[in-house]
């Protein structure tokens, strides 16, 4: 397998607060919550969004309206570059 000239670099990570059923975050749609995280990382790092090639976001129990690629939808609705690849991972607890 050939080595790539462009290594993968993780610039920053950030997570949302842990919520509970009918808690303070229950009225906030998952895309709005993830949008706050994505925007905060772009602002915090000062990176040019056009330089970001891949975004990975996590979401628990994607059903119904959430069953699409939430990370991609959030990225685009925030007005960030169409050229950025986005992936949503189902991040259920293993306990």
Residue ranges and their predicted role:
Residues 9, 53-56:
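Conserved beta-strand elements of the Class I
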């Amino acid at each position: 397998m050939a080595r790539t000239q462009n290594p993968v670099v993780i610039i920053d990570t950030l997570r949302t607060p842990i919520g509970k059923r009918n808690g303070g975050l229950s009225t906030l749609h998952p895309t709005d919550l993830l949008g706050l995280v994505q925007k905060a990382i772009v602002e915090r790092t000062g990176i040019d969004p056009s330089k970001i090639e891949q975004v990975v976001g996590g979401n628990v129990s994607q059903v119904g309206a959430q069953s699409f690629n939430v990370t991609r939808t959030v990225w685009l609705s925030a007005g960030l570059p169409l050229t950025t690849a986005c992936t949503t991972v189902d991040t259920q607890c293993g306990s």
